[in-house]
């Protein structure tokens, strides 16, 4: 899975941590934004965070999984901002997701 992160001006955002949550962990994250992610990757100089999901680990029981990718500033009960995109990922397929860090409220 390739996640491209852009800032509010549409420019690539480098060095940004992108969190990935599986179905179960995202339900917990929705109630507590300090929940540890299933996986995390940082955007490179091209604004791309790459998640490699080996079939035997992620798709052993099913050929498709729903993952949510999150960029978060701050955390806890207040003073935080979250941008996310959820997507069904099929084993063996490359998926490209874009997250735009728009300013609140948007």
Give names to the regions the model predicted.
Residues 80-106:
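Extracellular beta-sheet/turn segments enriched in Thr/Pro/Gly and aliphatic residues
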Residues 9-34:
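Short, ordered, surface-exposed loop/turn motifs in non-cytosolic proteins
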Residues 57-77:
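A short, solvent-exposed beta-strand micro-motif common in secreted/extracellular proteins
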Residues 28-54:
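Short, acidic Ser/Thr/Gly-rich low-complexity loop/linker segments typical of extracellular
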Residues 17, 22-24, 53-57, 73-75, ...:
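A mature extracytoplasmic/lumenal domain signature
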Residues 1-7:
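A short, amphipathic beta-strand motif
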